[in-house]
Amino acid sequence: MSVLSPIRRTAMVLAAASTLGLLASPAHSQETPVKFQLDWRFEGPAALFLAPVAKGHFKAEKLDVTIDAGNGSGGTVTRVASGTYDMGFADLAALMEFHANNPTAPNKPVAVMMVYNNTPAAVLALKKSGIKTPADLNGKKLGAPVFDAGRKAWPIFAKANGIGNVAWTAMDPPLRETMLVRGDIDAITGFSFTSLLNLEARGVKTEDVVVLPYPAHGVKLYGNAIIVGEGFLKKNPEAVKAFLRGFTKGVKDVIADPKAGVALVKARDGIINADLELRRLKLALDASVLTPDARAEGFGAVSGPRLSLMASQVADAFATKERINPDAIWNGSFLPSATDRNIFATAKK
């Protein structure tokens, strides 16, 4: 039986330690999986989330991100709250409503980055209806799905514009614009960039449509934000910061080259009309992302007084069980620096 010399024994221990270190090192660079749900189908604006995946921005942040389509902001909020998804993209009013109506629910999602600084909600009518201003909506028949953001926020719009009684008709989303074209209703509410192009697809010329955007008529609600489940946020704060960094880089890519962004959407859902979705994306950027309010507040951030006003307006309009605490639904501490979030300096193609 041989006895190892102290020098040889030390060398073997060091070699073993080195080998173990090499074997263990991949664990330190392991990617954090993130399941993310959009608010809607894969349409033009989805490029904002598909770009950082395709461009490798999330990978560079050590994240393994999967993006799934949604079927409405309310559903996305609920699925993030249930833990089915870690993060999502949803209308801030829907998040506020969930908080106020489910005060004891565990894992309530929190908004960590504002993407649509101005709500895309709008009233749309055909010019031949004679509707030109909000006042013309008095006594008219309006239509929208019951969960539509514009319909739910209608009391805020009506109060701001002195509109009295209107009659509402509910329908599934695919029938909204069809019923307007048929004359079953006088006007609809919907996201401007969605309904305008849906009307065009049904043979209506853009110049024959009247669009009354909520933000242009006294309703300065925030739109869609990135939300995170409370549990995921507490367990993975650095991953959330990394996600927002990667996402912001992707937004800059899409602003610089919207056509390339839509190509990524087409790769994910081959049945889309790329030209139509390019227009939808550009409309969304102009109406909700690259806005004067977003420039003033900083992309991704919110204004405290404006957020508080919205919380009060939503609580009244939605008749929530409890009042809404804006501090409970918003956490801006995970945002990248203001310099990194300056998307307005991005050159466009």
Spans of model-derived segments:
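Sec/Tat signal peptide C-region and signal peptidase I cleavage site
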Residues: 23-29
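Surface-exposed patches in mature extracellular/periplasmic domains of secreted proteins
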Residues: 68, 111, 168, 254-265, ...
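Short, surface-exposed acidic
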Residues: 165-168, 206-209, 271-283, 320-329
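Bacterial N-terminal signal peptides that target proteins for export
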Residues: 2-14
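Pocket-lining segment of extracytoplasmic ligand-binding domains
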Residues: 92-93, 102, 175-178, 182-274
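Short, glycine-/small- and polar/acidic-enriched structural segments
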Residues: 30-182, 186-193, 212-214, 219-220
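Conserved C-terminal helix/tail region of periplasmic/extracytoplasmic solute-binding proteins
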Residues: 307-349
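Secondary-structure end/capping motifs
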Residues: 235-319
